[in-house]
């Protein structure tokens, strides 16, 4: 059972790293799209007005194209944050909760950028842990198998995570 659990954890690290690469790219793209676009709680209203104007053949601010693309990316991020699928039993309130975890066009540009920056750090962390797990597996074998110092991958991972926090505490 332990070997099976260890293999599942190893696979989890690799899956998280692969997902993180896609998430990271999407976050950077969203940040670039909305870099100079003023957004906030009224963005959905403005988007609908721009859509009506476009339907009537009127020119609209090209920023609205960026907003539409960013919304599509935000929807993809919801799936990524949910593990690739929302499943059959997910309620609307669950989806709304997951949406609010990630960057959205309804957030202020500054607030959204803080969320994007943290999510990129988290994605980078997942990629690093996946690489570390692969290296350990190649050198030592199973993740729970101790090395010559008597420490397992998880011991080193705990120490590394403590030394490399995603968020530094305010003084």
Regions found by a protein language model. Give the residues of each.
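A sequence/structure-level signal for intrinsically flexible, low-complexity segments enriched in small
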Residues: 1-171
């Amino acid at each position: 059972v332990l070997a099976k659990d260890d293999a599942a954890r190893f696979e989890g690290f690799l899956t998280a790293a692969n997902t993180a690469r896609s998430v990271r790219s999407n976050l950077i793209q969203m940040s670039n799209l909305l870099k100079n676009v003023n957004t906030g709680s009224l963005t959905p209203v403005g988007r609908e007005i721009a859509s009506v104007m476009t339907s009537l053949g009127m020119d609209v601010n090209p920023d609205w194209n960026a907003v539409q693309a960013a919304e599509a990316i935000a929807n993809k991020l919801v799936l990524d944050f949910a593990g690739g699928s929302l499943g059959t039993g997910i309620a609307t309130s669950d989806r709304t909760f997951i949406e609010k975890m990630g960057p959205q066009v309804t957030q202020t540009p500054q607030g959204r950028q803080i969320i994007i920056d943290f999510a990129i750090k988290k994605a980078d962390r997942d990629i690093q842990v996946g690489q570390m797990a692969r290296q350990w597996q190649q050198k030592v074998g199973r993740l729970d198998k101790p090395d010559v110092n008597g420490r397992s991958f998880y011991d080193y991972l705990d120490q590394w995570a403590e030394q490399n926090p995603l968020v530094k505490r305010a003084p």
